[in-house]
Curated annotation (Swiss-Prot):
Upper classification of the organism: Bacteria, Bacillati, Bacillota, Bacilli, Bacillales
Pfam family for this entry, one: YbaB_DNA_bd
Protein name per Swiss-Prot or TrEMBL: Nucleoid-associated protein OB0030
Major location category of this protein: cytoplasm
GO function terms (MF aspect): DNA binding
Region (Disordered) residue spans: 1-23
Keyword DNA-binding: yes
Sorted UniProt keywords: Cytoplasm, DNA-binding
Length: 104
């Protein structure tokens, strides 16, 4: 019985190490999304930090700031959703079969 418990603890430690490595790899990744046919591009790290916003000159219209704001929001939300999906896919492999809602 004690051997089984030790074995299980070793397995958990291995899984924890793999999870941390996967999380580190996610944090190092860069994600990119565009809106308006490439008029606005937003780049973010896997830590959900916005690292770059590119706006094409043609889309800057002082009389239509709302459109530019909408494009920035759309690209930002898209890139954040990409990060969430990748995180769920990557980390989900560790929680398959476990009942841990809202873990990631």
């Amino acid at each position: 019985m004690k051997g089984n418990m030790n074995n299980m603890m070793k397995q958990m430690q291995k899984m924890q190490k793999k999870m941390m490595q996967a999380q580190d790899e996610l944090h190092e990744m860069t994600f990119e999304a565009t809106a308006g046919g490439g008029m606005v591009t937003v780049k973010a790290s896997g830590k959900k930090e916005i690292i770059d916003v590119e706006i094409k000159e043609e889309v800057v219209d002082p009389d239509d700031i709302d459109m530019l704001q909408d494009l920035i929001l759309a690209a930002t939300n898209d890139v954040l959703n990409q990060i969430d999906e990748k995180t769920n896919d990557t980390m989900g492999q560790f929680t398959k079969g476990m009942n841990m809602p809202g873990m990631f």
